[in-house]
Regions:
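Local sequence-structure signature of Cys/Sec-based thiol-disulfide redox active-site neighborhoods
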Residues: 1-22
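Structural micro-motif
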Residues: 38-46
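Thiol-based oxidoreductase modules, predominantly thioredoxin-like and allied folds used
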Residues: 5-7, 23-34
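Short secondary-structure boundary/hinge segments and terminal tails
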Residues: 36-37, 52
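A short acidic, often aromatic-flanked loop/helix-cap motif at beta-alpha or helix-coil junctions
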Residues: 33-36, 59
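Non-catalytic, surface beta->alpha helical segment in thiol-disulfide oxidoreductase systems
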Residues: 46-64
Length: 64
């Protein structure tokens, strides 16, 4: 399962848009949940316990 930890930033919005346009399924989690897990720099995409920062997450989303 893919988990997206996002906030209200432009980067989060653009990543959500890219994931949705490629029809990639993900669970959306809040900034509070991210902070509780120690993710301070959002957005963060977690795939099979592998943490992807914004740049890597966008690459993943664009590959579909």
């Amino acid at each position: 399962m893919i988990k997206l930890y996002a906030n209200d930033s432009y980067k989060s919005f653009s990543l959500i848009f890219e994931l949705d346009s490629r029809e990639i399924d993900y669970e959306l989690h809040s900034q509070d949940e991210a902070s509780a897990l120690g993710y301070n720099k959002l957005p963060v995409l977690v795939i099979d316990n592998k943490i992807l920062d914004y740049k890597k997450a966008m690459r993943y989303a664009k590959k579909g």
